[in-house]
Amino acid sequence: MTTTVSEEAVLTKPIPAFYCCYLLRSAKRPSALYIGSTPDPARRLEQHNGFAKGGAKRTERNTLRPWEMVAIVEGFPSRTGALQFEWSWQHVHTTRHIGAVETDQLNRKRKNPPTDKGSGIWTSTPKVLGNLHQLLRSTYFGTWPLTVRFLSSEAHNHWQRWIERADGLLPDTIRVKLDFRAEGASVLDSNLPANDMTHIDATYGGIQEHLAKSTSLLGDNTNSLSCEVCQQQLSTQTEIIVVCSHRRCHAVFHVNCISQLFLEDEGSSGLVPILGECPACRQEVTWVELMKELSMRLHGGKNATKLLKGERKDKANTQGTKSSKGGKKPAKTGDYTLDGDYEDLDEDWMNAVNVEPSSEDGDRNAANVKGSTGRVEIVIDDSEEDGFD
């Protein structure tokens, strides 16, 4: 099966190294919750707690700090997808996706508003997690290869209790991961959460070896490669080639061949597979990791070159950042990031774009800018949206 570069429909820029929607909880007042999104949970948590610039105004109050992340939803293939999910999670009373979920009861008029009128702070962990469960079961988001990572045993217990009374189960595309860490405030500094989220790799370091292997393999064997699925010879100049992500496996495929194989193995009628077994090494491979390396190889440009050379680009706070109380955070080591990866939006970005996807729209659609006749892609890193209608 042949797929020419001119017919490419993979991406026009590298898939983000990491992007998640998160649920914050106040360590001082556990009933206070906040929903947001970010490509860097550790940095974003510093912002919310006043140790770095850019935190949301709704989380500035010292009576609520420190904030801790108790759950994140990860695996989004683009920033736009994460923003669509964040908006729907924040606006469950208006999003069209909840209505498609069986018969679970949801108060869409929200008789129980946030703690303070207009504060944007939620007050019920079970309700917020219940809303999340319904979104993940919706026709639209239920087809995405997302993972819900719980960092709090208490939050996971609320989740489990919701599941016991919910009408339906999560689709097979959705995974749940337990990653319990110390909760509440740090015993060393009450202004810091016990879990600072630095254990999560939000960089491209995870694909460096895969990218190096693919670049070498495709560069050295331009006339001797054949697709592991259809057995036809591959052209590195005219075809989109996918390489197995496992270290010792050198299997290569037409992107359409391996996609179709994975879909058949899944018994799926969808367009995009979730994961599958490499026909050569017989190990499990996720579609997202294949596409992340492919998109970096095809569209990374100088950033892909940096990654291959192992060059590290330090973040702005490498030398340490002062806290709102005059303290200083330890310096961080460099990360594998891309130029332009951390362009923050204004706090009212949601007022300028429409991120609610229609039932016909896929993640390929960019957000529609108000007052514009064309479509532009949202290029952002952190959600600065504070309010919930």
From Swiss-Prot:
**Does the keyword field hold Nucleus?**
yes
GO molecular function, a single term: zinc ion binding
What Enzyme Commission number(s) does the record list for this chain? 3.1.-.-
Bias category Acidic residues: which stretches? 338-349, 379-389
Listed cofactors: a divalent metal cation
- The UniProt record lists the GIY-YIG domain at 17-99
GO cellular component term of the entry, any: Slx1-Slx4 complex
Task: State the compartments where it is located.
Answer: Nucleus
Its predominant location is: nucleus
Zinc finger annotations (SLX1-type) as residue ranges: 227-281
User: Which keywords are on file for this protein?
Assistant: DNA damage, DNA recombination, DNA repair, Endonuclease, Hydrolase, Metal-binding, Nuclease, Nucleus, Zinc, Zinc-finger
Q: Does the keyword Cytoplasm apply?
A: no
| Residue segments, region Disordered | 303-389
Biological process annotations from GO: double-strand break repair via homologous recombination
Query: What's this protein's family per the entry?
Result: Belongs to the SLX1 family.
Biological role stated in the UniProt entry: Catalytic subunit of the slx1-slx4 structure-specific endonuclease that resolves DNA secondary structures generated during DNA repair and recombination. Has endonuclease activity towards branched DNA substrates, introducing single-strand cuts in duplex DNA close to junctions with ss-DNA.
Q: How does it assemble?
A: Forms a heterodimer with slx4.
What's the protein name? Structure-specific endonuclease subunit slx1
